[in-house]
């Protein structure tokens, strides 16, 4: 384990500017799962029990608070009353703990880092993960840090390059940590499982090349399996020891396999851009993988799709090119059902059974989950600038962010009308 040569800065509440737009006004919302990892409770972008108002008011959802974080692409996680996220400014990465109800800063943990702005704005792309006791973050250059969730004090750290021999990918590390049981996992080309309290390495997998993806842990055929999507392709590992169970090669330009796969009924969908496309494979009892279909017609570039019934809703096409658009796609057959070009280059969630898309230009859209045709139930301009970060939901609110300015907005989903 390596220790930081420099003392990180920890700032308590009130250091950065914050605007509370509805001070003291908190609506009661039904109990719902916490958003402790990237893409929510089950890492599938879906959450129930929010009590979301639908349709939304004509004027849009109520904005509760706003916070400037600095440049970056990190999303948010929420455990209890604490929200965790990250940004970059003044040659440092900053991990923030905010009060989820008000946006008030609880603490800020800062450490030296490069902006890593190759072909984009840069800043942290990894989303912090938390179990309420610890917060974990992976920086663009490979610093993997455990922070006390209550105090903001560093507990331990590794460096995935110096300690484990990983190589920084072309656009820097962007996968997020995953907490499962007493372990924390990170994919840095090789997947590493550590004791979440001490940082002791429990196992390391072989190295599969560039890593931009967040690992998943799922039970398949009665066995706990780690699913990763790395430079080699779709990879299944034994959760107990990291041993390889299966690999489905998926060569993508620049090895950018970044979107979280989707598991449904022992079938896995995965997708990448640069013209590579998407595929669905069946996981057999012996963990061999059989291709069900492959297609060039559904290219998820950065952000994964959501599954409603047997239909996927997500973004097709390279985020830097004009062809990107929201599509509905048949999970079972690989058929494109519809396309909506007015919504592009963003992220998508499934909230109380409704599709909610944030476009790359900051428009928030409530969509009827209908494979027959695109139907926007409500839409409004939630924020400006480039919005490539995945949204998150907790405490009856949706959290949306833009990238260069790093403004995080909280919008009330419940009690609207």
What are these regions (language model features)?
Residues 33-68, 94-96, 102-117, 153-166, ...:
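Aromatic (tryptophan-biased) beta-strands that constitute blades/sheets of beta-rich domains
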Residues 40-43, 88-90, 140, 189, ...:
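Short loop/turn segments immediately following the C-termini of beta-strands
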Residues 83-85, 137, 186, 228, ...:
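Residue position within the beta-strands of beta-propeller blades
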Residues 14-26, 191:
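Bacterial N-terminal signal peptides
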Residues 64-77, 108-129, 157-179, 204-223, ...:
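Extracytoplasmic beta-rich repeat domains
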Residues 92-95, 276-281, 321-327, 363-367, ...:
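Structural motif
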Residues 99-102, 148-151, 195-198, 238-242, ...:
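Short loop/turn segments that connect beta-strands within beta-propeller blades
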Residues 80-81, 132-133, 181-182, 222-224, ...:
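Short coil/turn segments that connect the beta-strands within blades of beta-propeller domains
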């Amino acid at each position: 384990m390596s220790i930081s040569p420099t003392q990180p800065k920890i700032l308590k509440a009130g250091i950065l500017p914050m605007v509370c737009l509805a001070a003291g006004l908190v609506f009661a919302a039904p109990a719902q799962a916490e958003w402790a990892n990237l893409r929510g409770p089950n890492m599938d972008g879906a959450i129930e029990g929010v009590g979301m108002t639908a349709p939304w008011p004509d004027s849009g959802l109520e904005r509760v608070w706003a916070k400037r974080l600095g440049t970056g692409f990190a999303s948010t996680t929420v455990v209890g009353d604490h929200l965790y996220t990250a940004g970059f400014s003044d040659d440092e990465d900053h991990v923030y703990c905010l009060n989820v109800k008000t946006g008030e800063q609880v603490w800020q943990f800062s450490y030296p880092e490069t902006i890593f702005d190759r072909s984009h704005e840069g800043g942290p792309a990894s989303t912090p993960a938390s179990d309420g006791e610890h917060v974990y973050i992976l920086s663009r250059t490979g610093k993997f840090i455990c922070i006390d969730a209550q105090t903001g004090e560093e507990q331990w750290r590794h460096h995935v390059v110096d300690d484990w021999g990983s190589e920084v990918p072309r656009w820097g590390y962007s996968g997020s940590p995953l907490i499962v049981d007493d372990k924390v996992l990170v994919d840095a080309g090789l997947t590493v499982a550590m004791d979440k309290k001490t940082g002791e390495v429990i196992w390391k997998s072989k190295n599969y090349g560039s890593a931009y993806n967040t690992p998943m842990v799922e039970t398949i055929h009665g066995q706990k399996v780690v699913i990763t999507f790395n430079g080699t392709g779709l990879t299944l590992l034994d959760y107990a020891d990291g041993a390889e169970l299966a690999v489905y090669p998926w060569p993508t330009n620049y090895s950018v396999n970044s979107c979280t796969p989707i598991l449904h009924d022992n079938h896995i969908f995965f997708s990448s851009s640069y013209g590579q496309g998407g595929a669905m494979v069946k996981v057999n009892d012996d963990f061999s993988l059989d291709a069900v279909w492959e297609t060039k017609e559904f290219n998820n570039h950065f952000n994964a799709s959501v599954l409603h019934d047997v239909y996927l809703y997500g973004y097709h096409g390279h985020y830097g090119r004009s062809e990107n658009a929201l599509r509905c796609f048949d999970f079972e057959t690989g058929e494109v059902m519809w396309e909506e070009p007015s919504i592009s280059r963003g992220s998508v969630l499934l909230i109380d059974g409704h599709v909610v898309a944030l476009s790359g230009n900051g428009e928030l859209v409530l969509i009827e989950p209908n494979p027959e045709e695109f139907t926007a139930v409500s839409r409004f301009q939630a924020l400006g600038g480039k919005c490539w970060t995945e949204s998150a939901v907790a405490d009856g609110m949706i959290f949306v962010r833009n990238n260069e300015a790093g403004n995080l907005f909280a919008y009330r989903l419940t009690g609207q009308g």
